[in-house]
Amino acid sequence: MKLQLVAVGTKMPDWVQTGFTEYLRRFPKDMPFELIEIPAGKRGKNADIKRILDKEGEQMLAAAGKNRIVTLDIPGKPWDTPQLANELERWKQDGRDVSLLIGGPEGLSPACKAAAEQSWSLSALTLPHPLVRVLVAESLYRAWSITTNHPYHRE
C-alpha cells in the first residue's frame, strides 16, 4: 500500500519542508509515502472562490486516481492515535493505495468531500495548512509504529 498526501499549496516554509521530509524518510519501503502539491488558485479581492475550489478539487481527485480518498476536514472523525493505527491496518488489508486530501484556505471542494470514503479531523481548531502536512506525516508514522511494535510510540 502506498500513502499519498495531496495538498493544495506550494512553496512551503523551510520548517514545513524539514519536518515533513523527516517523517517521509522514516516510512518503510513497503509503505511509501509521497506528497503531491496542487498549485493554489489565485485568490484576490474579487476572486471566484467556488470556481477556484472546483478547479483545485478536480486536480486533487485526478492526482488521487482510483485510490481510497480520505479527506482532512474539521467535521471529519476525530481519530486518536490507536484508532488511526487501526484505520491504517484496515487500509493495508483493503489493498488499495490511500490518498489523504488537504484543501486550501477555503477547505475542500464539494466534489472532494463527496468522493471521500472517510473524513478525518485532526482537531476542532482551524489549523494552518502547512502545519497540517507535518502533523499528518507524524501521525501516520506514529500509527505505523504502533502496528509494527516499533519503539517510536510509547504508551
UniProtKB/Swiss-Prot annotation:
Its EC number is 2.1.1.177. Gene3D superfamilies: 3.40.1280.10. Keywords: Cytoplasm, Methyltransferase, rRNA processing, S-adenosyl-L-methionine, Transferase. S-adenosyl-L-methionine binds at residues 72, 103, 122-127. It is found in: Cytoplasm. One of its GO terms (cellular component) is cytoplasm. Belongs to the RNA methyltransferase RlmH family. Specifically methylates the pseudouridine at position 1915 (m3Psi1915) in 23S rRNA. NCBIfam families: PRK00103.1-1, PRK00103.1-4, tRNA_RlmH_YbeA. Homodimer. This is Ribosomal RNA large subunit methyltransferase H.
